[in-house]
Design a protein with these regions (language model features):
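DUTPase catalytic domain/fold
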Residues: 2-311
């Protein structure tokens, strides 16, 4: 869980550790996740820019939704450009180009690279990190952001100036995307944004971040899976069907659950065996409330817990 603060001084001050007076008796640190108010200022300043206007609905409380442009490249393999540019690597790895301006199908088992409409001209002290939107994860579309000179997926260094690209790989369902489809979001950070376990415990005491049980805090907040239900007929999750058909990612609430998902029912042992390579949606046991002063994100992969990704 990360600290989120909101003074305009985020963009101007030279010290991440500086503090400023807010309300009486309150100090405001310049380290943290930048909120929507500051993202708007960055857009006005040209530090975030786009092929077209950035709409208000793209700006979330602590992130910015990013949009696909009109072209997709099917590529032989995913890559990081390291010291070079993404465009240079594309000349070696692109198989063919697809016009997605009016919609196109991205097939399962294939890897695509799409330039994004948004681009950055970041101040030196502002970094960015990208992750899939929750709606993207729920249909098992794997995405990773890259930029020129990047050595890591989903991370943009402070001071970066240039375009952004999104790697897309549908895992379970073939999907329809088009120019303007929003699959991932970007958070902007300054300084140290991670809350310590001590800070998390204090936050739970004050704001009750887990409101239906004990908060298991150790190197972050642990989240468990709920496999208990009221009756044996109760559903505890869903398993995705293979070969179920196309999903248009710009048409939410269009599809019937039964066409794409098989229910997972509770059993006597309150446990299930996950089939390798299959995709499941399971609910957490914990109910979480994130205070307005903070933002939270899940660790996508932790080998000490299991060899699987979570969204």
């Amino acid at each position: 869980m990360s600290k989120k603060k909101s003074p305009d001084l985020f963009l101007d001050n030279n010290s991440d550790e500086a503090e400023f007076k807010g309300a009486p008796g309150q100090k405001i640190s310049l380290s943290g996740i930048l909120p929507g108010q500051i993202i708007r200022t960055m857009i006005e300043n040209g530090e975030i820019w786009s092929q077209g206007n950035i709409s208000e609905e793209q700006i979330q409380p602590a992130s910015l939704d990013l949009r696909l442009s009109d072209i997709a490249y099917r590529i032989r393999a995913s890559f990081l450009p390291s010291e070079g540019s993404v465009q240079e690597k594309l000349t070696e790895l692109a198989l063919h180009k697809i016009d997605i301006s009016d919609g196109a199908v991205l097939e399962t088992g294939c890897v695509y690279l799409v330039p994004l409409m948004e681009a950055l001209s970041l101040p030196e002290r502002i970094k960015a990190i990208s992750n899939p939107k929750s709606s993207t994860g729920r249909v098992d579309v794997f995405t990773r952001l890259i930029c020129d000179g990047s050595h890591e997926f989903d991370k943009v260094p402070g001071g970066y100036k240039g375009h952004l690209w999104l790697e897309i790989s549908p895992r379970t369902f073939p999907v329809i995307v088009r120019q303007g489809t929003r699959l991932n979001q970007m958070r902007f950070r300054r300084g140290n944004t991670k809350s310590s376990d001590k800070e998390l415990k204090k936050l739970h005491t004050e704001d009750n971040i887990v409101f239906n049980g004990k908060a298991d805090i150790a190197e972050g907040l642990a989240i468990s899976v709920n496999l208990k239900a009221a009756t044996e007929e109760s559903i505890v999750g869903y398993k995705a069907k293979r070969h179920a058909g196309l999903i248009d990612l710009d048409k939410p609430n269009k599809y019937k659950v039964a066409k794409f998902w098989d229910p997972v029912f509770m059993n006597d042992e309150s446990r299930i065996i996950l089939d390798p390579g299959e995709f499941y949606i399971l609910a957490s046991h914990e109910s979480i409330a994130v205070p307005p002063s903070h933002a939270a994100e899940m660790v996508p992969f932790n080998p000490s817990i299991g060899e699987f990704r979570v969204h």
